[in-house]
Amino acid sequence: MPDVKKNVIVNHSVDEMFNLVDRIEDYPLFLPWCGGSKVLERNDDITKASIHIKYSGVNQSFTTQNTKDYPSRIDLKLIDGPFKVLEGYWIFTKIHEEACSIEFHLHYEFSNFILDKLISPIFSQIANTFVDGFVTQADKIYKK
């Protein structure tokens, strides 16, 4: 099963980065592979949302429940979609008021062999550039 791990240090606060990741409804604005997103439920503890991947001929949607520990952690767990397994987390660690480290980990397995062969190379590319998209968007909206 593929694992994606990424660690970066950014010149943005943990609050800014946590909020950017939690605003799933904004993903289509800055993630080129995201063909749409819909928040199904949101409260202080969880965000349930569906994301539509529309990229390089792939047209798939999945739904996750994201358990939140503001502002330090978001855990992702699959509810529905073309995966047998999709789970991961974001960890935001304060370095000082205007900087933090971000640790992203994603573990996934597609539900069948055909999907794995068709979608896995594209999903791997998406997952490996995921954090970069958030850093670029944070630099843009927080103007640092």
Give the location of each predicted region:
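Short, highly charged C-terminal tails/helix-capping segments
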Residues: 136-144
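Beta-strand/loop substructures that line and gate deep hydrophobic ligand-binding cavities in soluble
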Residues: 78-129
